[in-house]
């Protein structure tokens, strides 16, 4: 009986470790990827930077990308 319980626990541990490894593999978004405001989704040394888009004075939504931390884009003067 103890052998069956220990075998079951060992299998559960192995399955859990495989699942955690699969979640960690490719879990972050690379530079230039579209992200949400969740900063944890971008890879290390990247942050999720968002800006609001306007067309002819009307807001067209918010766009977010993973960019290097500290990098800022600004509108080019026309």
Curated annotation (Swiss-Prot):
Residues 23-26 form a propeptide. GO terms for molecular function: toxin activity. Keywords: Disulfide bond, Secreted, Signal, Toxin. It comes from the Eukaryota. The keyword Signal applies. Expressed by the venom gland. It is found in: Secreted. Contains 4 disulfide bonds. Residues 1-22 form the signal peptide. One of its GO terms (cellular component) is extracellular region. Belongs to the neurotoxin 19 (CSTX) family. 07 (U7-Lctx) subfamily. This is U7-lycotoxin-Ls1e. It comes from Lycosa singoriensis.
